[in-house]
Amino acid sequence: MARTASFDRDAVVRAAMDAFWTTGYEGAGIADLERATGLRRSSIYNSFGSKRGLFDAAVEQYLDDVIRPRLEPLTAAPVSPDAVIGYLAGLRDAFADPASLAARSGCMLINTAGAPIGEDSAVAASVSAYRDELRAALKRGITARLPHLDPGAADRLADACTGQVVAALALARIDRSSATAAVDTALALIAAA
């Protein structure tokens, strides 16, 4: 008879999320995940099927705990005209603070896109879906702030701002000042529109 798992699944997934976020999928070995989660290898495999299964759960947790709460002011109805500026300013502040996880580790999904695991079709689809979610949120914020823009101009501005945010997220762990400058560029693009 199989034993029932006796651990807090959410706490385990969050601990794994932190490990993957900090060191990446390839950098987090099973021994590292055992230390981070407090589970033994057999429990990881029995509960999640594989290291990859735990990673997939960690990605979903990252979206739910980190990404969607930050995007919520841009996705809730109605969107405040100040929401997009608030989002970008918050991102800029996070990059400027050397103690913040965003400044030290960047974005778990953007980091994953540039790693070997990013070539996996399911992982690539998750990263692409995140980028689409980010773009849609930024477009809603841009439209709320600049209702006079025609739809094509709003689309182009959303594309440009999304590119700047993705660049900032990719740069955060290696060059915080460049990450901050990329966010400043997005803010300047909105101010100029």
Predicted regions: what they are:
Residues 8-17, 33, 58-62, 66, ...:
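Generic hydrophobic, amphipathic alpha-helix propensity
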Residues 11, 19-58:
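Helix-turn-helix
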Residues 90-94, 132-144, 148-151, 155, ...:
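C-terminal peripheral helix-coil segments that are non-catalytic and often amphipathic
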Residues 82-86, 104-107, 119-146, 156, ...:
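Amphipathic alpha-helical packing segments from all-alpha helical-bundle domains
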Residues 51, 58, 62-66, 91, ...:
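Hydrophobic/aromatic residues within well-ordered alpha-helical segments
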Residues 15, 19-22, 69, 73, ...:
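Solvent-exposed, amphipathic alpha-helical segments
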Residues 94, 98, 114-119, 124, ...:
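Amphipathic C-terminal alpha-helical segment
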Residues 71-105, 157-158:
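Hydrophobic alpha-helical connector segments
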